[in-house]
Amino acid sequence: MESERSCLLSSHDAGKGGSSSVSSASFNFINSIIGSGIIGLPYSMSQAGLPMGLLLLILVAFITDYSIILLVRGGNLSGTHSYQSLVRSTFGQIGYIIVSVLQFLYPFIAMISYNIIAGDTLTKVFMRIPGVGPGNILTERHFVIAMSTVLFTLPLSLYRDIAKLGKVSLLSMILTFGILMTVVVRAATLGPQIPASDDAWVFARWNAIQAVAVMSFALICHHNSFMIYGSLQEPTLSRWSLVTHISVGSSVLVSAVFAAAGYATFTVYTQGDIFENYCRSDNLATFGRFCYGVSIITTFPLECFVTREVISNALFKGGELSKSSHVIITLVIISATTAISLSYDCLGIVLELNGILSAVPLMFIFPSACFLKLSNERWCRGENLIASMILVAGVFVMIIGLIMMALFPQDCSHGAEMFYCSASNTSSTASPSNILQFINTTQNTSIV
């Protein structure tokens, strides 16, 4: 394996690099990982049980880290520089078509979810502005989505060099800490006021496989791995491993704290979009919504870069797009995602479906399968054993996840105020006695 490593390192040492430093590439990678999926992680804890959910999150993070490096190693072994070309070199045209469809669908659906979040989140922020009532145009999700597209996501998506998004990604990371602070503070102040059910703290639940799908959606970044790898000033395996470890490690730390704090606050009442749990009159939650809405807008262009690259590889054989082709393809992608997000607003189902159909194959199955086929060792020996286990786990999660999704579909409670919000009309949360009194009254009424 030492000789193989030397070959891998030398294969790109002489290759043409980009303009990104390790820190800039890490910012872009972390921004790609911590996208819309993080908002559903508290709900995944509700599906799996908090202890089991955290264990599964760490396991999925390990698989993410390991398979990202496998992906680039496979690319170096085969002499390819994109996910699609790697799969074509190992599994032929059929494999190329399948992975192209998946690699297109994942970021495309992710962009739809980003628009849904921006529309749902920022409208609630604008409602808190004095003088902005329910009939105001700023409270219309269609208007907010359209304006955020025209003013922000479209101009940023028109960049040709992903390295130019480094500063925007840094801004997104700063905003992410604002979101994290909101959830953690409310776990301490609001959590004790919402009584948990008897099974709120069980070790594990049967819906754990569905939780893995949501976690996979939250942590996947394989679809733009080659793009960020190629943007490094010196694209070597050692530098790429450092970027991967920093990015995945930082992301899973933020994700674990976010998931645990969010679930601890609302337990069995946790929604697919955690911000749907907070009352509209909560000023701190409004700050968190603002941070998340802006963060999502800055993440959108990264996914557009990937979608555009997939189209370029499929239609133009990977050649560099002309300026006019670049603009036209970008406009088509943005228009399509915007049109769909304007007509559909149920986020939870979008996250879970994208996790099972796109994220799991791209994260678990294809990186392991490509590396195993390119490796000369047996599947049951050395590091190939880990790749084999990841491959089997991916197939299992995908099949069982689809079955569980059909048997236990998510409810879409978009825009509904939670019952405990009626107990207080102030921007700060109500006293515990008021909340508990309201909940007990509601429960007694339902029993009668």
Swiss-Prot record:
Residues 1-20 are annotated as: Disordered. Keywords: Amino-acid transport, Glycoprotein, Ion transport, Membrane, Sodium, Sodium transport, Transmembrane, Transmembrane helix, Transport. Glycans are attached at residues 425, 440, 444. GO terms for molecular function: L-amino acid transmembrane transporter activity. One of its GO terms (biological process) is sodium ion transport. It is a multi-pass membrane protein. InterPro entries: AA_transpt_TM (IPR013057). Signal peptide: none annotated. GO terms for cellular component: membrane. It comes from the Eukaryota. The keyword DNA-binding does not apply. It is found in: Membrane. The chain crosses the membrane at residues 22-42, 52-72, 94-114, 143-163, 165-185, 200-220, 246-266, 286-306, 324-344, 346-366, 389-409. Putative sodium-dependent amino acid/proton antiporter. Belongs to the amino acid/polyamine transporter 2 family. PANTHER family: AMINO ACID TRANSPORTER, SODIUM-COUPLED NEUTRAL AMINO ACID TRANSPORTER 11-RELATED. This is Putative sodium-coupled neutral amino acid transporter 11. It comes from Danio rerio. The gene is slc38a11.
